[in-house]
A protein has these predicted regions:
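Gram-negative and organellar
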Residues: 1-197
Length: 197
């Protein structure tokens, strides 16, 4: 924890076997405006390298993303995401480069607490931004308890965004969601509770 509002995150692992060699690293920087708890943001960068020992193939992947959530008012919440994925791989002698970008936003309105309704829109681009796929959906949610929410929704149209969107369903069609909001203070309270027993 860097300060009252800022937190840095880092994780790395490396695995080597007779069949495969894999390394992965994740770096993140999180912000929470603790004075009013109305703004959260997270920037993340992930790197993965895979080298199968027998084939000579390889895969190098980079994913960068930024997420933000803003409680604009008591009833209105807005969140958005920007992400990009770069992939270089060699398979069966052929080398390929892939780059895709994702931008998305969602607004939720609490019309009759604990019920809320939401609208979401997204765009996925590739081939130097020349190719675009769009997505849009509607959602109905209910707060089950403090910081716990369940939802059902329908994406009117959408796309697959492998490796880019970790929390949202982007495929067309119906979906069910469940969310739990927490921070590092939860783990502190669990430790204190365990020590008191």
């Amino acid at each position: 924890k860097l300060s009252r509002d800022w937190t840095a995150l880092a994780r790395a692992h490396w695995t080597e076997t007779a069949m495969d060699d894999e390394a992965q690293a994740r770096l993140g920087l999180a912000y929470r405006r603790t004075d009013d708890n109305r703004l959260d943001a997270l920037a993340r960068w992930e790197v993965t390298r895979r080298h199968p020992e027998l084939t000579g193939d390889y895969q190098h992947e980079h994913v960068a993303s930024a997420h933000a959530a803003w409680q604009a008012s008591r009833a209105l919440a807005v969140d958005d995401q920007l992400a990009a994925r770069w992939l270089v791989q060699k398979r069966e002698g052929f080398k390929a480069h892939t780059a895709v970008q994702l931008a998305g936003g969602r607004a939720r309105w609490q019309f009759a607490p604990p019920w809320d309704a939401g609208l979401a829109g997204r765009v996925l681009t590739s081939n130097h931004f020349d190719e675009k796929q769009f997505g849009a959906g509607v959602e109905l949610g209910r707060a089950l308890a403090k910081n716990v929410r369940a939802s059902i929704g329908w994406n009117l149209f959408g796309f697959r965004s492998e490796g880019l969107s970790t929390s949202d369903v982007t495929d067309a069609g119906p979906y069910v969601g469940f969310g739990w909001k927490f921070d590092e203070s939860l783990f502190g309270s669990l430790v204190k509770g365990g020590e008191s027993k």
